Amino acid sequence: MRSPCAALSASLLLLLLLLWARSSVGCNKALCASDVSKCLIQELCQCRPGEGNCSCCKECMLCLGTLWDECCDCVGMCNPRNYSDTPPTSKSTVEELHEPIPSLFRALTEGDTQLNWNIVSFPVAEELSHHENLVSFLETVNQPQHQNVSVPSNNIHAPYSSDKEHMCTVVYFDDCMSIHQCKISCESMGASKYRWFHNACCECIGPECIDYGSKTVKCMNCMF
């Protein structure tokens, strides 16, 4: 027989989840569900800034932590985003990792693996094509007014050998994950950089890649 306390806790959880579902039409549930549920259960995000009550704002922000920007609308703490205009898959955050281990990354991505990730390789020239067009645009439009535009010297205009096609190898994890977990996972496999899409898809970028890998989401269980 269930105790009254357990029944009350279950009812409270159901009520909180129903309230969340009602107020999170534009919410990125794939990314935010776990953390939002935790904060709601702890009753740290119950106030409504839109109605002039921000008594819990600080506690709610601390609870959501690094996911505040992406998830504050899920708990009614900020204005809802219109994801139809800018879908999360079209935006991403990139960062270089300070201590890559190229030999480890190559070893983990050689041949077929039964792990929960997808290995994708493509020509470095393809990786750079979008960036090259952007740099050319910046250099030619209103040139007298843009003398201070800086262009990275280690990729676009550097000599590029066509004797052997260089390949950029990246790894997409199958499941959604937080940006913090994405960074840790890519570090643990020796990647040089990582790209975290705002739908929570994680891409680890190998040492042969010149820029930041692919801009296309290819996480099997985290596509939207």
From Swiss-Prot:
Organism of origin: Gallus gallus
Q: How does it assemble?
A: Interacts with CHRD and BMP4. This interaction enhances CHRD/BMP4 complex formation. Interacts with BMP7.
Question: Where do transmembrane segments lie in this chain?
Answer: none
- The gene name on file is TWSG1
* PANTHER family given in the database record: TWISTED GASTRULATION PROTEIN HOMOLOG 1, TWISTED GASTRULATION PROTEIN HOMOLOG 1-A-RELATED
Among the GO biological process terms of this entry, one is: regulation of BMP signaling pathway
Name one matching Pfam family. Tsg
Comment block on domains: The N-terminal domain is sufficient to interact with BMP4.
* Keywords assigned by UniProt, alphabetized: Developmental protein, Glycoprotein, Secreted, Signal
Signal peptide (UniProt feature, chain positions)? 1-26
Glycosylation: which residues? 53, 82, 148
Q: Name one GO cellular component term.
A: extracellular space
Q: What is this protein called?
A: Twisted gastrulation protein homolog 1
Q: What does this protein do?
A: May be involved in dorsoventral axis formation. Seems to antagonize BMP signaling by forming ternary complexes with CHRD and BMPs, thereby preventing BMPs from binding to their receptors. In addition to the anti-BMP function, also has pro-BMP activity, partly mediated by cleavage and degradation of CHRD, which releases BMPs from ternary complexes. May be an important modulator of BMP-regulated cartilage development and chondrocyte differentiation. May play a role in thymocyte development.
**Where, subcellularly, is it found?**
Secreted
**Family in the record:** Belongs to the twisted gastrulation protein family.
